[in-house]
Amino acid sequence: MIRAAIVGATGYTGAELVRLLARHREVELVGLTSRQYADQPYANVYPHLSGQVDLACQSQDIDHITDMADVVFLALPHGLSVPWVAECVRKGKKVVDLGADFRLRRAAVYEQWYHVTHEAPELLAEAVYGLPELKREQIQKARIIANPGCYPTASLLSIAPLCGQGLIREDRLIIDAKSGVSGAGRNANLAIIYGEVNENVKAYNVAKHRHNPEIEQEVAERAGLDPDAMAITFTPHLMPMTRGILTTVYADLKEGVQPTSEEVRNLYRQFYAGEPFIHVMDEGVWPQTKWSYGSNHAYIGLTVEARTGRVIITTAIDNLVKGASGQAIQNMNILFGLPETTGIEAAGIYP
């Protein structure tokens, strides 16, 4: 059995990790930490997991947690993961960081967007960006997994098959993204209380969202471009729903390139052939967030708009599962040589 600990287990991504790992046949949960709920039974914090988890929340004792676990999941705000990652590396333990501290490979870019100094820039080069459909071989050999952000997951799955194919302007993408409120975390925040969110849709962090450089970094790598030359427009919106992300990517075709929708769809199906969680839809079938609710599955719809010379790609995922905790477990499965779908194979909850 793989002994797993979750640091920051009482936020939404931490709770989703607990829910999924509690029924993972190859995992034993050995530690759940929480600053707010230390010493309280976990099921008191999340009663829906009564009978599933009999552990109490612990304080964040870095030596104790890293000693007893084979893999440590970090579900912490940015700026807090570095000491945990450094200790896991020192002790030869695997670590999957669901935060932002190791996603960006250049410390200067991280510091520009997150406004904190990176305390272990020497570890950035070792961290593997954990999007399994794109980085599976690197993940297999990794010690540090930087679990992607929720918006970048959906955005990159949308555009990856077209990158480097000579078909589109990868540096000029436009990404419109919509997310459920759980993406904002579990905290007392006026912007996400019921009266503010219900029957309301709003854009936020326009032209300054921290997932923008993450998307640009990975698109540039796949397309063989300079990340500093990227000019991707990314605009997120908050939706009056609990879970789900829907991204729509607009990609300009290069001059003289005129593929049909069917040709592009075949390219996507070849690219994702054999991927258990990726589903490329038929022409005219557009993904819905309800399809992926509670699951690790991603649904992709696309068309070529010949009139404007663009490819339009829409992708739906669950922000807490494929966009966070499910993908983290998918990465763990790869790290330990397990079937990739173990513990996360279930379809979404519908309706």
UniProtKB/Swiss-Prot annotation:
Q: What protein does this entry describe?
A: N-acetyl-gamma-glutamyl-phosphate reductase
Record's subcellular location = Cytoplasm
Keyword Protein biosynthesis carried by entry: no
Gene3D superfamilies noted in UniProt: Dihydrodipicolinate Reductase, domain 2, NAD(P)-binding Rossmann-like Domain
What is one term from the GO cellular component aspect held by the record?
Answer: cytoplasm
Reactions the enzyme catalyzes: N-acetyl-L-glutamate 5-semialdehyde + phosphate + NADP(+) = N-acetyl-L-glutamyl 5-phosphate + NADPH + H(+)
User: GO:BP terms for this protein?
Assistant: L-arginine biosynthetic process
> Superkingdom, according to UniProt?
Bacteria
Q: Kindly list the organism's lineage.
A: Bacteria, Bacillati, Bacillota, Clostridia, Eubacteriales
Give the protein's function.
Catalyzes the NADPH-dependent reduction of N-acetyl-5-glutamyl phosphate to yield N-acetyl-L-glutamate 5-semialdehyde.
Q: Which residues form the active site?
A: C150
> What Gene Ontology molecular-function terms does this entry list?
N-acetyl-gamma-glutamyl-phosphate reductase activity; NAD binding; NADP+ binding
Family indicated by similarity: Belongs to the NAGSA dehydrogenase family. Type 1 subfamily.
Q: What is its main location?
A: cytoplasm
**Pathway linked to the protein:** Amino-acid biosynthesis; L-arginine biosynthesis; N(2)-acetyl-L-ornithine from L-glutamate: step 3/4
Q: Which UniProt keywords apply?
A: Amino-acid biosynthesis, Arginine biosynthesis, Cytoplasm, NADP, Oxidoreductase
* EC numbers: 1.2.1.38
